[in-house]
Amino acid sequence: MRCPKCQHNKSNVIDSRQAEDGNTIRRRRECDACHARFTTFERVEEVPLLVVKKDGTREQFSRDKIFNGILMSAQKRPVSSEDIENAITRIEQNIRRNHDGEVDSEVIGNLVMKELADLDEITYVRFASVYRSFKDVDEIEELLQEITKTVRAKKESKK
């Protein structure tokens, strides 16, 4: 593993443990040359997932694309990067479990919306307003009524 500081290609593993998602190994390393410490992550290389877009084209599944979409919707909201990463991990696991190498972009969008509904209502509404491409205010109002019912039901179940 190449050191990010001096580019030397020899390092020693100081600590190794399983990351929270259970699918990744987190390793602390120390460079043999400059003694800088850095973290690496190791995960199993899985069969690539292909996303089938609305126009029929296919592209490789991208965690970064989902992360950036959620991050934009979560600006100035109490949603951490870790929350987003965990949600994306659940989405990807769901897709790998239930689809054979290809998944429609609509399925991914719906899974993201489901995760965001549980994570933060405002982030959910922001994401939905872009994802669903609302045509008028009435469609937004329907979404707000839907999320309001869900939030009230959650509050009632906690009592």
UniProtKB/Swiss-Prot annotation:
Keywords: ATP-binding, DNA-binding, Metal-binding, Nucleotide-binding, Repressor, Transcription, Transcription regulation, Zinc, Zinc-finger. Residues 1-21 are annotated as: Disordered. Residues 49-139 form the ATP-cone domain. A zinc finger (unnamed) spans 3-34. Binds 1 zinc ion. The keyword Cell cycle does not apply. It comes from the Bacteria. One of its GO terms (biological process) is negative regulation of DNA-templated transcription. Its cofactor is Zn(2+). The keyword Metal-binding applies. GO terms for molecular function: ATP binding; DNA binding; zinc ion binding. Pfam families: ATP-cone, Zn_ribbon_NrdR. InterPro entries: ATP-cone_dom, NrdR-like_N, RNR_NrdR-like. Belongs to the NrdR family. Negatively regulates transcription of bacterial ribonucleotide reductase nrd genes and operons by binding to NrdR-boxes. NCBIfam families: transcriptional regulator NrdR. This is Transcriptional repressor NrdR. It comes from Streptococcus thermophilus (strain ATCC BAA-250 / LMG 18311).
